[in-house]
Amino acid sequence: MNGKFEGFIKLAGKFISILQGRKKVLGLFDKKTQKEQEDYFDHVWNTRRFRYMFKILFNKKMLAKRGLVADYFTFDDGSKSFADSFYNRSRKAFRDIPIQSNYFTSLYLLGKYNSLNVVPAYLKEENFETIKSRVDRIKIFTNEAQKWIDTIPDHTIDCFALSNICELMSEKETHSLFSSVIRTAKDDARIIFRNLMIPREVPEDLRNSIKKDEPLSKKLFDTDRSFVYGKVAAYTVQKNGNK
């Protein structure tokens, strides 16, 4: 978590831990069933002080101090403010997503992984040899996405993970990026991208080639263990447009 926003979320996690107290935080991670977790959130965790904390942390002045500008944010989740939106997202993470398997929440609240068995797949011991044998396949490029993708030959990529990079792009820049995705993608290539606060979608005139998988998108969003994103969406590139 090294970016400005990631650093802010890390700070918010520390603040929540102090506010709730270590005993209450550990109590959340002790819940073994979903019903126990839901009841704990409803009757122990979700205090007036906890809810008010979001108004303190997630406001324009506080965000500006952390180098984040909130003026461009809009909401497509029914929230009236930045604070309301992030309260709703935290509620989902702490109440509805199984806490025992959520290593993101563990990092946010405990500052560490709570169990060696509940870590990202790349950190699991059983995957070490596979990763070690294939590490030469990893290539790191530091550049703007559009400049990088312009160097890639046609029909060569089978997966795109675009995070939320479109949020600060203009409509023209977004259209250019997704046009390049179509050009460089193999047929049936998969795409995943996210929205933090600004609603973004594949440009309408490209949707015949980039088709959204609505059921998979809903499943990914409903089970997303990182609560900060307001949208998780999956797509398939279909170059003939008629599958």
Residue ranges and their predicted role:
Residues I157-K172:
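A short SAM/SAH-binding and catalytic strip from SAM-dependent methyltransferases
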Residues D187-P199:
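Conserved beta-strand signature within the Rossmann-like core of class I S-adenosyl-L-methionine
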Residues N143-C159:
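A short acidic, Gly/Pro-enriched loop at the edge of an enzyme's catalytic core
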Residues K147-D150, E167-S170, P199-P203, F227-G230:
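Flexible loop/turn segments at secondary-structure boundaries
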Residues E173-D187:
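A short glycine-rich, Lys/Arg-flanked "PGG" loop and its adjoining helix->strand segment in the class I
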Residues M1-S133:
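Class I S-adenosyl-L-methionine-dependent methyltransferase module
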Residues E214-K243:
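Core SAM-dependent methyltransferase catalytic element
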